[in-house]
Design a protein with these regions (language model features):
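A membrane-periplasm/extracellular boundary helix in multi-pass inner-membrane enzymes
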Residues: 245-323, 348-350
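Aromatic-anchored transmembrane helix interface
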Residues: 48-54, 79-87, 99-127
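Interfacial loop-to-transmembrane-helix boundary motif in multi-pass membrane proteins
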Residues: 74-82, 122-155
Length: 463
């Protein structure tokens, strides 16, 4: 009986890394269930939150069970120390912050810690698989399935007229049946390089160009959301893919069989990118940028008029024909997040030393309405303070520096479409997190970043 139990546990342990990878496919399904919970059942605690936090606990349990594996003790020690720092910040805020919501504080901590716990869990799981090629094949396949579910459901929602708009105002865009448009565009942006990688891997001749269909579907769905993030990620990814495909073609063109594959994919990538650039003026993003500037100019004129009536001096910005002013450019790039950032800087300036060190918690020292800056690194800094923020950055800096050194020291070997697209996923994730948020503080998004980071760490033998 005891032997049977041990065998069963070993089997479960062997299957768990596969389950961790398979969980990628369930992400869009959880997001659809979240929408159903909110819009139909009117629940605040959604299925997505409950399942994802349960999954995080499973990943943590898996890490603890494999504490003897190389690096595991280091990860566990870090999580314990980080947990203590977060607990100090939470207790401090419960004592001195008013108003304060215990539930929102804990939820934000859990959401922020989610990618770090999962990162350690995935590193251990991928090491247990002991087959990087198998892991890579599974990852790009599961990313493809998740993207197809997202793309097809958005297109189906739009076709049936049952979709939700991305914006509450006059801007154009559709988020399909999904709840959060910003999260959705971040997911597409982070997954897009992996879908392009899948298309490239499968397209070995012109007769197999149909493998680029998932890429085109993902492009269409992402563009129809109407955000800058989705469009920017597509252009950057296709640009990187085209550049490195051409370089690989030039390198392998004399090798039998290999050169032709790179030529086919270079031509297809060029056509897809060229087609997008030609159609850009007709896309929601182009129309939204124009609408955004009109709204911005109207708000500015109202404010200027108000200031004049109050006797304030209104500074006129230099405005050359066809050029944007600095404030217009900032408004377009940050979607006015920089204004909330000023509010947070004031909160932080007025905060006591304990909050400067251990953070002001969720939404800072707000008075009535809870609102994040929606720029991940800023939100994390203000929420966790100097000590907590540095602790949070530690694994990202540690692994980031190691990956960068490995890429530089093995440049010829790693100078490939595969590694450059994987690296672009990480850069896009952190860039989007910095500029428009909804990556590190959104469990629905951060899992995709974490899986690719964990794969690169194991594949490049960094840990």
């Amino acid at each position: 009986m005891e032997e049977h139990m041990v065998t069963k546990l070993k089997q479960t342990d062997n299957y768990f890394p596969h389950f961790l990878l398979l969980f990628i496919v369930f992400q869009p399904i959880l997001d659809l269930l979240t929408s159903f919970s909110i819009y139909v059942l009117h629940m605040s605690a959604t299925v997505g939150i409950v399942v994802r936090f349960a999954f995080m606990l499973l990943a943590l349990g898996y890490l603890l069970l494999h504490h003897k594996q190389q690096g595991a003790k280091k990860y566990i020690l870090y999580l314990c120390l980080f947990g203590i720092v977060l607990a100090i910040g939470l207790v401090n805020n419960l004592m001195i912050k008013s108003p304060v919501s215990f539930g929102e504080e804990v939820k934000f901590i859990m959401k922020s810690v989610y990618p770090i716990v999962l990162l350690f869990g995935y590193i251990i799981a991928l090491k247990e698989l002991k087959n990087n090629e198998f892991a890579f094949h599974k990852i790009i396949t599961y990313f493809l399935y998740a993207t197809l579910i997202l793309s097809i459901s958005i297109i189906a929602a739009m076709a049936t007229g049952t979709d939700f708009p991305s914006y509450p105002n006059s801007k154009i865009g559709s988020r399909g049946w999904f709840f959060a448009g910003n999260d959705l565009s971040s997911i597409f942006a982070i997954m897009f390089p992996i879908v392009v990688l899948y298309s490239f891997h499968k397209t070995t001749s012109f007769s197999k160009v149909y493998y680029w269909i998932p890429t085109v579907l993902a492009m269409y769905a992402s563009i129809m959301i109407g955000t800058k993030v989705g469009y920017g990620a597509i252009v950057i990814t296709l640009g990187i893919a085209l550049f490195f495909l051409f370089i690989e073609y030039m390198t392998h063109r004399k090798k039998e069989g290999k050169g032709f594959t790179y030529l086919v994919n270079t031509i297809v990538a060029a056509i897809v990118l060229g087609g997008l650039l030609v159609l850009t003026p007709q896309t929601p993003i182009a129309k939204n940028m124009s609408i955004h500037l009109q709204i911005y100019e109207y708000k500015k004129s109202v404010q200027d008029e108000k200031d004049r009536k109050e006797g304030k001096v209104v500074k006129e910005e230099e405005h050359k024909q066809g050029e944007l002013t600095d404030s217009e450019m900032k408004s377009l790039i940050y979607s006015d997040r920089d204004k909330f950032l000023k509010v947070y800087k004031q909160y932080y300036k007025e905060a006591p030393l304990s909050q400067k060190l251990f953070g002001m918690g969720y939404a800072g020292n707000y008075t009535t309405k809870m609102k994040l800056v929606e720029m991940d690194f800023h939100d994390l800094f203000f929420a966790f303070g100097i000590v907590g923020f540095l602790m949070y950055l530690l694994p990202l800096l540690y692994f980031g520096i190691k990956i960068f050194i490995r890429l530089i020291t093995n440049f010829k070997k790693l100078f490939s479409v595969k590694h450059m697209l994987l690296a672009s996923t990480l850069v896009l994730s952190l860039g989007i997190g910095f500029m428009s948020g909804h990556v590190l503080t959104a469990p629905a998004v951060s899992i995709f970043f974490v899986v690719i980071l964990a794969y690169l760490i194991v594949d490049l033998e960094i840990e």
